[in-house]
C-alpha cells in the first residue's frame, strides 16, 4: 500500500468522491495556491502535506499540518500522507524556528492524516509515546471528548465529532475561538462522510462550540466558521426536501392510475428522476446512488420515508401523513 493510502477508498457510503475525478480536477484548477509554510495566526503555523495530486484528488491543495503554540515547545495537528517532501519540510521548518514538539494530535485514521507519523517518530523518537488519536492503535495514546492539551500560548480542547469517520475529532483553540475542523468541514466545497445523520448531528455540536475561525485539514482558513457550518446544514436539508418532493410526486403520479398506490421507487429510479440522463453511469453508480441511499436512510431514521421490498428489491416511498 502506498504511503498514506487507505482513507477515501474505505470510506464511504455517503459519497464516493473519487467518482468525481474529472469534476474535481477542473475544480482544483480554480483553487487558490497556498504557500508550503505560512503563519496563519499568532498561534498557528500551517505546513502543506505536499500531496495535492493524491489518488482521488480530494486533498485539495494538500493535507494541512498545523503547528500550534507560541513557545519553543508546540503541538502538531495531523501529519500528512507520508510524503518524503513533507517530512523534509517539517524538519527544516521546526529547526529554523527553534521549535520542538510535545504532542501529535490526529483528527482521524485516514492515511492522508496519519501517514507522516512514522517519519515524525524517525526524526523525533521522543514522540513515539506522544501520538494521540481517538480509538487509538496499541502504540498510540487515547483522546477523549473534552480532553485538554496545553503548550505555551495555546489551550487545545478535543471534541468528538463523528460523521466523516467514527473516530473523528475536532480541536478547539480556546485563545482564538478557533477550531481545527479536520475533514468534517473543508476550506473549499463539502466533505465526504461515512454516515450522514451522524455528521449532521456533529455539525450542530460543532456549531455549539461557537468558534469564529476554522482551520480545516484541507483548503484555506475559514474566516466565518459559523456561516460555513450553517451553509453546510442548509445544503443537506435542502437536498432532503428535494428527495421528499420527488417521492411525493412519484406517489401522486401512480395514484392517478391506482388509488392506493405508494409510488415506491428504487434508488436508481430516484436518481434518474432527480438528475436526468445527462450524468454518466460511473458517477451515478459510484457517487449519486450511494449518496441518495444515505439520504434515504437518514430520512427513514427520521420517520419521513419508508421502504418495501418487492422481489428482493428495496423500493422507497413517502408514507401518508
Curated annotation (Swiss-Prot):
Gene3D superfamilies: Ribonuclease Z/Hydroxyacylglutathione hydrolase-like (3.60.15.10), Winged helix-like DNA-binding domain superfamily/Winged helix DNA-binding domain (1.10.10.10). Its cofactor is Zn(2+). Its EC number is 3.1.-.-. Keywords: Hydrolase, Metal-binding, Zinc. Zn(2+) 2 binds at residues 112-113. One of its GO terms (biological process) is secondary metabolite biosynthetic process. The keyword Zinc-finger does not apply. It holds the Pfam family Lactamase_B. Binds 2 Zn(2+) ions per subunit. The active site is at 112 (proton donor/acceptor). Notoamides have been shown to exhibit antitumoral activities. Notoamides A-C show moderate cytotoxicity against HeLa and L1210 cells with IC(50) values in the range of 22-52 mg/ml, but the IC(50) value of notoamide D is greater than 100 mg/ml. Moreover, notoamide C induces G2/M-cell cycle arrest at a concentration of 6.3 mg/ml. InterPro entries: LACTB2-like_MBL-fold (IPR047921), Metallo-B-lactamas (IPR001279), RibonucZ/Hydroxyglut_hydro (IPR036866), Sec-metab_biosynth-thioest (IPR050662), WH-like_DNA-bd_sf (IPR036388). Lactamase-like protein; part of the gene cluster that mediates the biosynthesis of notoamide, a fungal indole alkaloid that belongs to a family of natural products containing a characteristic bicyclo[2.2.2]diazaoctane core. The first step of notoamide biosynthesis involves coupling of L-proline and L-tryptophan by the bimodular NRPS notE, to produce cyclo-L-tryptophan-L-proline called brevianamide F. Belongs to the metallo-beta-lactamase superfamily. PANTHER family: ATROCHRYSONE CARBOXYL ACP THIOESTERASE, ENDORIBONUCLEASE LACTB2. This is Lactamase-like protein notP. The gene is notP.
Amino acid at each position: 500500500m502506498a504511503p498514506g493510502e487507505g482513507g477515501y477508498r474505505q470510506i464511504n457510503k455517503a459519497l464516493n468522491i473519487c467518482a468525481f475525478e474529472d469534476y474535481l480536477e477542473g475544480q482544483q484548477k480554480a483553487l487558490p495556491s497556498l504557500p508550503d509554510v505560512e503563519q496563519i495566526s499568532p498561534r498557528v503555523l500551517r505546513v502543506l502535506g505536499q500531496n495535492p495530486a493524491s489518488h482521488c484528488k480530494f486533498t485539495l491543495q494538500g493535507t494541512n499540518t498545523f503547528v500550534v503554540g507560541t513557545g519553543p515547545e508546540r503541538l502538531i495537528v495531523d501529519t500528512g500522507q507520508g510524503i518524503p517532501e513533507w517530512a523534509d519540510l517539517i524538519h527544516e521548518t521546526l529547526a529554523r524556528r527553534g521549535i520542538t514538539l510535545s504532542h501529535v494530535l490526529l483528527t482521524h485514521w485516514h492515511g492522508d492524516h496519519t501517514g507522516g507519523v512514522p517519519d515524525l517518530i524517525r526524526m523525533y523518537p521522543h514522540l513515539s509515546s506522544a501520538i494521540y488519536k481517538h480509538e487509538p492503535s496499541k502504540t498510540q495514546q487515547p483522546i477523549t471528548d473534552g480532553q485538554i492539551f496545553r503548550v505555551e500560548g495555546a489551550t487545545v480542547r478535543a471534541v468528538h465529532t463523528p460523521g466523516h469517520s467514527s473516530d473523528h475529532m475536532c480541536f478547539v483553540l480556546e485563545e482564538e475561538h478557533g477550531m481545527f475542523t479536520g475533514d468534517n468541514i473543508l476550506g473549499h466545497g463539502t466533505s465526504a462522510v461515512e454516515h450522514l445523520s451522524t455528521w449532521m448531528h456533529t455539525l450542530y455540536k460543532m456549531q455549539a462550540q461557537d468558534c469564529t475561525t476554522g482551520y480545516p485539514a484541507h483548503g484555506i482558513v475559514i474566516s466565518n466558521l459559523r456561516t460555513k457550518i450553517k451553509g453546510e446544514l442548509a445544503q443537506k436539508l435542502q437536498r432532503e426536501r428535494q428527495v421528499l418532493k420527488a417521492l411525493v410526486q412519484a406517489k401522486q403520479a401512480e395514484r392517478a392510475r391506482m388509488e392506493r398506490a405508494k409510488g415506491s421507487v428504487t434508488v436508481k429510479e430516484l436518481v434518474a428522476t432527480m438528475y436526468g440522463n445527462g450524468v454518466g453511469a460511473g458517477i451515478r453508480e459510484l457517487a449519486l446512488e450511494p449518496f441518495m441511499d444515505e439520504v434515504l436512510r437518514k430520512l427513514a431514521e427520521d420517520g419521513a420515508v419508508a421502504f418495501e421490498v418487492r422481489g428482493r428489491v428495496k423500493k422507497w416511498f413517502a408514507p401518508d401523513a
